Amino acid sequence: MALRLVFYYPWFPRNWTQLGSFPYANYHPTQGYYDSADTNVIKTHIRSIEYGGFDGVISSWWGIKSDEDQNFQRLLETTVSQSSPLKWCIYYEHEGDPTPPNADQIAGDLAYIQKQYADHPSYMKIDDRFVVFVYGSHTTGLDTVKKWIEASKKTKPYLVLKVFSNYRSCPQQPDAWHEYAPANPLIDQSPDGVTISPGFWKYGEQPRLTRDLAAWQRNVRLLAKRSKLKFHLVTTFNEHGEGTPIESCKEWQTPSLQGSYLDVLHNTRPIT
């Protein structure tokens, strides 16, 4: 059975303000412009993610002692306190930097993640190995794969790298692949997974993917039929700057209090 996972961003309130603009968002979350460290916000998000039928969450991570790192600990602890079955893993963002980290830097980060989080009951594991999703950039290629496999020899995480041209031809392969390109409504990376997005409207720009609830319903139904994949991925729960959230916003409120996009996920579970 495929794991239904959603990308999550624990970087607020910092990122409500960007490039001198507040709020740096086109939509209005029903919780307001919240603080990601607020336990009540985290509890509400956990309930919403559970309502959407998700098995786990891929949480943006920007390095040791970053806001996202400190909030990740809060996410794990609050999940346990709520007796939630949700599992969390890290989305390693620095691989997308103009100058990505080298193998030694990655190895150090993986050692930290393993020591700090991997044994937590709410951290995601596959085949008894802690899961790490890795972002990428236009420079990602064969050398990136080689670097990550070298860097992970000691810690042995379950690595899910971001795709690039001819990624299947790499002589060395990670455990799985994913795509993160939320301006596309559906991306098929079988047999690893399928990624769907509700829309993409970056603040200050024209929409690159206009929201269409009927199209979202069709894509969620299609996803539900693909149970033999490794992952069903959704971009995103709350990346407001790029206009990809599925969390409840004033623009799509519903009687469930969860919003139209989560309602569709709630009512369309994977077919076994």
Q: What role is predicted for each listed range?
A:
Residues 1-272:
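Glycan-processing catalytic domains of CAZymes
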